C-alpha cells in the first residue's frame, strides 16, 4: 500500500498543475463560453460519427457513445485521453522500428501436416500470416496444473543457464519466489550470463517500484518498465500482460503464473490459487526469444543496455525431431492493430469444434462475436464449459463477469466456479486435438487492450494434460445453474448496466 501511495504522490502535483491551468483557462475564456460550447458540441458530434464508423468492438463503441452523448464535453475529453489508440502511437512507432530492422522473410508457402484437415490448415495459415510466427514441431513440452509444481523446475533450469536468461512478467512482487529467482540471476550474472528483466509498470505498481529496480541494477541486472504509467497520458491501457522466462534460447516457461508468492500458494489472499503453465524446449523457444527481444530493443534505452541481436526465426514445419510431440505456434497479441488475434482464434476454433470446447478463465466479459460463437457451438451439440473462480480477487470485476452468466447459461453453456479459491488459469482445449495456453483472459481488456502471449498446440500431449486437469478441477467446482426468472427479473437491470461498463474493466 505504501508503494501505491508514493506513486500517487508523484502524480498529484501534475494533476494539480493541470487543474490550475484549466481553471485559469476557463476564467479567461468565460466571455466566449457560448461560442466555445457550440464548437465543442460540433466536435463531439463528429467524434460520435468517428466512433461509429471506426473498426472496433461493438460493446466498446457503445460504452463511449453513451458517455459522450450523456456528457458531451467531459465524455469527449475522456475518450481522447483513454478511449482511443492514438495514445499508443509512441509504442507502435518503437515496435515498428524494431520489426523493420529485423527484415523478417515471408513465411514460405508450404502445406502443414494436418492429415487432410483442410479447415485446420486454413486456421494455421491465417494465424501465421497475422502474427508472423511459424508453427513448429514440439520436441518436449511439460504441463503444470499449479504454479507450485512449475517453480522448482524454473529454479533448476536457471541454475543450469549458460548463455542468457530473459524474464518478462506483468507482476513481480518481492517474496520467496522472486527472491529465489533474483539469487540465481545474480549468480549467473557473475558467471557472464546475459540477464534481462522486463516488468509492466502498472501491473507491478503495488509491488515493484524504483527501489526494487535500483537493487537489480546494483547487482548488474538490466531491468526496464514497460509503458510507464502516466495518468494524464492515458497509459492505463496497452499493458504488457505477457509472462515468459526464456533460458539459453533452449527452454521457455509461460502460462498464467506471475512472479509472486500467491501464484505458488505461499500466500492465500483468495483461498487456493489455481493457475497453470508449461515448459517447452527446442525450436519453438526461438519464438519466445524473438518476442522478448522485440520488446527489449523497442523499449530499452540504448545508452543504458544496448540493442541485442534478434535471433533467427524458428523453422517452419521442420522434419520431426527424435522426440516428436505434435506442433505449436507461439505468438504475441498486440492492441496496436485491429486484428484481436486471440479473440478471432477462439471464434475460429469454436466454429470447428464438434465434441467439446472447455475454457479456464479468471474473468468473463465477452464481446458479442465470441459470445455468439460459444452459444452457436453449444446449440449445435458441442459441450461448452467454462471454469471460473469461486473466490474472486476483485469483487466488482467478478460481479461484472457474473452479469454474463444468464445469457451463456440459457444458451447451453455450462459454467463452474472453483470452490477452494481463485482460478487464474487461461487455457482452452477442444476435441482432443487442439489447445491454447498463455496469458489471455476472456475479458475485453485482455482480448483487445493488452499485449498478450499465447501458444496454440495441435495434436500434442499437452492437450490431454489440459483436459485431464480440467476434469480434475471441475470435480472441485460448483456448477452454476440458470437463474430462476422470478429472481432474475430483479437483477437484469443491474446486469445490463454492468455489461455496458465491462469494456473498461
Predicted regions and their residues:
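Helical hairpin unit composed of two closely spaced alpha helices linked by a short loop
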Residues: 363-384, 389, 394
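Catalytic-core elements of nucleic-acid end-processing and repair enzymes
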Residues: 426
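Thr-Gly-centered strand-to-loop micro-motif
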Residues: 360-361, 388, 418, 437-438
Amino acid at each position: 500500500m505504501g508503494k501505491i501511495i508514493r506513486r500517487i504522490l508523484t502524480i498529484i502535483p501534475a494533476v494539480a498543475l493541470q487543474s490550475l491551468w484549466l481553471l485559469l483557462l476557463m476564467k479567461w475564456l468565460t466571455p466566449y463560453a457560448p461560442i466555445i460550447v457550440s464548437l465543442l458540441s460540433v466536435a463531439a458530434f463528429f467524434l460520435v460519427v468517428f466512433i461509429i464508423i471506426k473498426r472496433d468492438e461493438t460493446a466498446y463503441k457503445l460504452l463511449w457513445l453513451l458517455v459522450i452523448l450523456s456528457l458531451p464535453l467531459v465524455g469527449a475529453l475522456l475518450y481522447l485521453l483513454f478511449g482511443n489508440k492514438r495514445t499508443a502511437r509512441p509504442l507502435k512507432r518503437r515496435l515498428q522500428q524494431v520489426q523493420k530492422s529485423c527484415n523478417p522473410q515471408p513465411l514460405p508457402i508450404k502445406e502443414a501436416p494436418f492429415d487432410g484437415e483442410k479447415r485446420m490448415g486454413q486456421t494455421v495459415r491465417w494465424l501465421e500470416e497475422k502474427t508472423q510466427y511459424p508453427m513448429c514441431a514440439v520436441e518436449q513440452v511439460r504441463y503444470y496444473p499449479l504454479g507450485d509444481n512449475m517453480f522448482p523446475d524454473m529454479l533448476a533450469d536457471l541454475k543450469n543457464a549458460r548463455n542468457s536468461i530473459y524474464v518478462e512478467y506483468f507482476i513481480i512482487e518481492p517474496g520467496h519466489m522472486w527472491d529465489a529467482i533474483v539469487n540465481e540471476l545474480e549468480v549467473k550474472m557473475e558467471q557472464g550470463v546475459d540477464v534481462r528483466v522486463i516488468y509492466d509498470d502498472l501491473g507491478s505498481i503495488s509491488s515493484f517500484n524504483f527501489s526494487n529496480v535500483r537493487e537489480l541494477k546494483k547487482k548488474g541486472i538490466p531491468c526496464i518498465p514497460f509503458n510507464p504509467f502516466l495518468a494524464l497520458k492515458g497509459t492505463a491501457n496497452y499493458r504488457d500482460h505477457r509472462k515468459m522466462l526464456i533460458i539459453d534460447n533452449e527452454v521457455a516457461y509461460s502460462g498464467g503464473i506471475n512472479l509472486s508468492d500467491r501464484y505458488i500458494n505461499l500466500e492465500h489472499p483468495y483461498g487456493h490459487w489455481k493457475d497453470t503453465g508449461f515448459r517447452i524446449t527446442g525450436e519453438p523457444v526461438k519464438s519466445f526469444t524473438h518476442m522478448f527481444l522485440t520488446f527489449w530493443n523497442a523499449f530499452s534505452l540504448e545508452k543504458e543496455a544496448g540493442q541485442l541481436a534478434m535471433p533467427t526465426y524458428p523453422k517452419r514445419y521442420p522434419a520431426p525431431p527424435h522426440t516428436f510431440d505434435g506442433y505449436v505456434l507461439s505468438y504475441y497479441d498486440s492492441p496496436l492493430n485491429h486484428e484481436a488475434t486471440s479473440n478471432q482464434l477462439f471464434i475460429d476454433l469454436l466454429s470447428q469444434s464438434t465434441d467439446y470446447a472447455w475454457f479456464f478463465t479468471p474473468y468473463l466479459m465477452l464481446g458479442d462475436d465470441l459470445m455468439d460463437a460459444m452459444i452457436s457451438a453449444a446449440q449445435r451439440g458441442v459441450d461448452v464449459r467454462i471454469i471460473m473462480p469461486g473466490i474472486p480477487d476483485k469483487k466488482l470485476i467478478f460481479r461484472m463477469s457474473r452479469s454474463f452468466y444468464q445469457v451463456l447459461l440459457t444458451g447451453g453453456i455450462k459454467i463452474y466456479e472453483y470452490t477452494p479459491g481463485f482460478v487464474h488459469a487461461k487455457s482452452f482445449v477442444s476435441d482432443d486435438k487442439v489447445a491454447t495456453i498463455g496469458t489471455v483472459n476472456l475479458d475485453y481488456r485482455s482480448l483487445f487492450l493488452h499485449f498478450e502471449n499465447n501458444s496454440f498446440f495441435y495434436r500434442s500431449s499437452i492437450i490431454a494434460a489440459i483436459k485431464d486437469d480440467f476434469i480434475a478441477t471441475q470435480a472441485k467446482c460448483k456448477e452454476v445453474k440458470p437463474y430462476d426468472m422470478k429472481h432474475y427479473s430483479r437483477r437484469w437491470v443491474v446486469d445490463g448496466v454492468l455489461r455496458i461498463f465491462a469494456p473498461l474493466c
